[in-house]
């Protein structure tokens, strides 16, 4: 995501699609294990900063518990290699994962392989890895992945999904891991090093390949076809969708990109044979009714897609007033109408 911060995740989207009717008398056939979750990676930082969260009745709640209360059934937690302040580092991730598991929430771990944000516009190498060549860097990536996952496993945590890289449409660990044109650089080497480390610690965990702009079929096909030719191995395709990202001082209509995202799903599944999870979703916090409508549109129009396995709202608990992030789904510490689909 392009982003700033926020972390809570009201990803309270739970089995919404599995609870609605699709036409008169028709039962939904969405994937039985469909999840509605949220990336809540900043929750511990927000708590330390004094922020509090409340349910609709005004009762104070711990953020992860509130996610569960509104219908969420999964969390996504990002990992940085050596963050300057410790937030989103190994120990912080273990704390948040323990909370989630105690509440019965499934856990997705999102490795950025950076000391801070990694996304399509920047994939900075961790400071400690900067002098390494590709072979040594692949080994460092594997060691970092193993270290974090073993810490989670040692704490008794189950992990259902692991992202090897964050929004890697242009590769990761630049420059050596950059993907451009017909070149994959060292990306496949790095991705497979992470994948093998995941499977060694959590053999049943699903490895996610994460790309941005789930509405942009041309770019997705370019990247996935290139990787198919390189023999890239992964279990799930993860996509991001921010259908009303601010442009020219205004929030554009959410419907065109959302409709394109939905239309792309059967094409991607037919071409590459992988289930899909929307691992990042966000809408302008100032327009909660539109955010709700966008989620409802996705859920309604994908209910027959068994290969579409879930949606994660990105940092819904983040508010522009509190943190400066304008695509959350809370106001004054409470979930807004944007998250209503989670509880249906």
Label every PLM stretch briefly.
Residues 15-18:
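C-terminal motif of bacterial Sec signal peptides marking the signal peptidase cleavage site
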Residues 20-22:
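Bacterial signal peptide processing site
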Residues 28-106, 112-141, 147, 251-252:
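N-terminal substrate-binding region of glycoside hydrolase catalytic domains
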Residues 30-31, 62-71, 95-106, 150-157, ...:
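Acidic (Asp/Glu)-rich catalytic clusters
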Residues 36-40, 75-77, 107-111, 160-164, ...:
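Hydrophobic faces of well-ordered beta-strands that scaffold small-molecule active sites
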Residues 41-43, 80-82, 112-116, 164-169, ...:
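Active-site beta-loop-alpha junctions enriched in small/polar residues
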Residues 48-52, 117, 267-273, 285-344:
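Aromatic-rich peripheral "rim/lid" segments of glycoside hydrolase catalytic domains that contact
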Residues 89-94, 98, 119-234, 246-263, ...:
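Active-site cleft segment of glycoside hydrolase catalytic domains centered on the general acid/base Glu
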